[in-house]
Amino acid sequence: MSRKRSKMSSSGTISNYYVDGVMAQEPEDVYAPRLIQASHTVTPRPSGAGDNADFSSCNFAPKPGVFSSSWSSVHPQGIYHPYVHHHHQPHLSATDGRYVGVRPWMEPISNHVSFAGFHPSNTRPYGAKPDVLPAKVPECDTLEPEARPVPAEFSCGGALGAEKVTKEQRRASEISSHGEPKDEKQQLDPNNPAANWIHARSTRKKRCPYTKYQTLELEKEFLYNMYLTRDRRFEVARILSLTERQVKIWFQNRRMKMKKMNREKGGKDQL
């Protein structure tokens, strides 16, 4: 067997492409007039039956055109598909080109692609290039754990598991925070209300202690004047970022503390 590379031309829209064909074992002098010269120039020949007549020994089967009358010169055999690759099936290289029946005894092509532009009756399977489209990423549900190990926090169920853990922690913290009041309520004796004051909780608001800076400024103001006018009280409250009521209460408490200290001091002097 000998491999011959020939350059063919057609009168249609597609021309000047190469065809690798496996020719039958015959003397070279039979195909000598058909070989292309070194100048690579070939006179155009009529397409269709004329081309098939030159290769009558290969049993070419002519097929009707698939397009309108203006496209009658182009046959399905002449359509070149860009996805046909020669190195996948080197012994069937003739199937990529114009002539189909070079090696009819060969095995059929495993991968086929159907073209929407052809009529179903005139369609011919073409060798498809494998792995043309990128592989689709499998979903998390269908992915096997052995195929792709992923940490638990980054897996599909990791987020749900983290949410469940946080919810459980919140519930545990709520139970622990509210556990003492429940125990206290259980310890209360409805039959003995006099003993309930031991476990009673204070309803007073928590004290809002003044900062050291605020206390120092209020002490200075108190030493300067034990009683503040309303205007001065508003001014001090504005400077110290306090309310007028807080300044008023602090001065009242400071005066009561001073009176108590004076009484204690007077009692010691009498003794």
UniProtKB/Swiss-Prot annotation:
Keyword Cell inner membrane belongs to the record: no
Main localisation: nucleus
Membrane-spanning intervals of the chain: none
Coiled coil: none
Subcellular location: Nucleus
Record bears the keyword Transcription regulation: yes
Composition bias, Basic and acidic residues: 164-187
Ranges of the DNA-binding region feature: 203-262
Alphabetic keyword roster: Developmental protein, DNA-binding, Homeobox, Nucleus, Transcription, Transcription regulation
GO biological process assignments: anterior/posterior pattern specification; DNA-templated transcription; embryonic skeletal system morphogenesis; proximal/distal pattern formation; regulation of transcription by RNA polymerase II
Top-level taxon of the source organism: Eukaryota
GO cellular component terms attached to this protein's record: nucleus
Annotated stretches, region: Disordered: 161-195
Disulphide-bonded residues: none
One Gene Ontology molecular-function label: DNA-binding transcription factor activity, RNA polymerase II-specific
PANTHER family in the cross-refs: AGAP004664-PA, HOMEOBOX PROTEIN HOX-D9
Similarity comment: family membership: Belongs to the Abd-B homeobox family.
Function: Sequence-specific transcription factor which is part of a developmental regulatory system that provides cells with specific positional identities on the anterior-posterior axis.
Record-given protein name: Homeobox protein Hox-D9
Provenance organism: Oryzias latipes
Top-level taxonomy: Eukaryota, Metazoa, Chordata, Craniata, Vertebrata
